[in-house]
């Protein structure tokens, strides 16, 4: 919580800058944040602008555009499961297709089968016609029971699937605010279980990729509401990655092959927070020619959500590179 308080203090003390230097730093001003938010809401109506309590409002943002929110976003798998990491099974368990575990066993003891067979033959002698009729009746009975059992097994499996999905289901409210200290968007998550009960922070951490859990995730009080605990996700190299994307666009322009929107989507699809311009570290400046076609500032949040998707792989919010 100390880290959360220090972060809030830093946000409060950092002066607001209204100058636009998106093309050189990858950072955005409050006005550009609003512009990017309008574009996100236009492309994906599940995201909406919202106001904040009077004492929590930021005067550098419009009263009705304090933050962006999307509610009840589904998450069916934890990050560990989504990334394909499996736990060991017990000795009595058998893993089936699609991750299901079969824990019961069928008793195929030969001695028991022999006893049952001898018991059937100890009942005395009957005539051949009675034996034939009895065998036919048994065959019909077996066929009927097999059909009924098959139907029951299918129903049980469907119920098992539904029960398992409901037990794993979580819902998230996602908030995007403007960070004055980093001059980039900042994401907050507030989660609920399948019964609508708020998740503990340690439970929400289960939905964050292990690569970022200890680096970019922090327990904080939601800054746009009172007494609401959240997990904040801030890719601290976000502005540097944006510069990487613009560097790709500039290089494409120099090769007389302007970076159109399709190329840009392909470039971002293969990038993550660890990518950088060859031969440069993230801390170094990247020279970008002015007026080079590439990412527009109103598309900023689409790229931002692309990054967040790698941090929270199991949360299914609306974003797509087609919006570029």
Curated annotation (Swiss-Prot):
One Pfam family of this chain: Autophagy_act_C
GO molecular function, one term: Atg8-family ligase activity
Region Flexible region: start-end pairs: 82-166
One GO cellular component term: phagophore assembly site
Protein transport found in the keyword field: yes
Subcellular location(s) of the protein: Cytoplasm
Domain of life: Eukaryota
GO biological process: autophagosome assembly; autophagy of mitochondrion; cytoplasm to vacuole targeting by the Cvt pathway; glycophagy; piecemeal microautophagy of the nucleus; protein targeting to membrane
InterPro entries: Atg3/Atg10
Keywords: Autophagy, Cytoplasm, Protein transport, Transport, Ubl conjugation pathway
Function: E2 conjugating enzyme required for the cytoplasm to vacuole transport (Cvt) and autophagy. Required for selective autophagic degradation of the nucleus (nucleophagy) as well as for mitophagy which contributes to regulate mitochondrial quantity and quality by eliminating the mitochondria to a basal level to fulfill cellular energy requirements and preventing excess ROS production. Responsible for the E2-like covalent binding of phosphatidylethanolamine to the C-terminal Gly of ATG8.
Recorded domain comment: The N-terminal region is involved in phosphatidylethanolamine-binding and is required for ATG8-PE conjugation. The flexible region (FR) is required for ATG7-binding.
Protein name: Autophagy-related protein 3
UniProt source species: Debaryomyces hansenii (strain ATCC 36239 / CBS 767 / BCRC 21394 / JCM 1990 / NBRC 0083 / IGC 2968)
């Amino acid at each position: 919580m100390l880290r959360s308080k220090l972060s809030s203090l830093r946000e409060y003390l950092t002066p607001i800058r209204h100058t636009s230097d998106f093309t050189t730093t990858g950072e955005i001003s409050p006005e550009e944040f609003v512009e990017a938010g309008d574009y996100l809401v236009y492309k994906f109506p599940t995201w909406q602008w919202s106001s904040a309590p009077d004492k929590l409002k930021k005067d550098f943002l419009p009263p009705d555009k304090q933050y962006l929110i999307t509610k009840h976003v589904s998450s069916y798998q934890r990050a560990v499961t989504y990334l394909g990491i499996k736990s060991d099974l017990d000795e009595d368990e058998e893993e089936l297709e699609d991750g299901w575990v079969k824990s019961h066993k069928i008793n195929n003891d030969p001695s028991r089968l022999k006893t049952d067979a001898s018991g059937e033959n100890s009942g005395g002698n009957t005539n051949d016609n009675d034996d034939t009729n009895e065998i036919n009746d048994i065959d019909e009975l077996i066929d009927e029971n097999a059909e009924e059992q098959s139907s029951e097994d299918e129903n049980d499996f469907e119920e098992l699937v539904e029960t398992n999905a409901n037990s794993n289901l979580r819902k998230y409210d996602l908030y995007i605010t403007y960070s004055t200290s980093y001059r980039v968007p900042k994401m907050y998550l507030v989660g609920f279980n399948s019964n609508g009960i708020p998740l503990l922070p340690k439970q929400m951490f289960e939905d964050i990729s292990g690569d970022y859990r200890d680096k970019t995730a922090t327990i904080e009080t939601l800054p746009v509401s009172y007494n609401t605990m959240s997990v904040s996700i801030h890719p601290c190299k976000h502005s540097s990655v944006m510069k990487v994307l613009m560097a790709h666009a500039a290089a494409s322009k120099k090769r007389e092959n302007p970076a159109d929107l399709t190329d840009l989507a392909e470039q971002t699809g293969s990038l993550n927070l660890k990518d950088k311009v060859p031969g440069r570290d993230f801390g170094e400046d990247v020279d970008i020619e002015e007026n080079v076609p590439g990412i527009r500032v109103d598309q900023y949040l689409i790229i931002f959500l692309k990054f967040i998707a790698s941090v929270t792989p199991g949360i299914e919010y609306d974003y797509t590179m087609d919006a570029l």
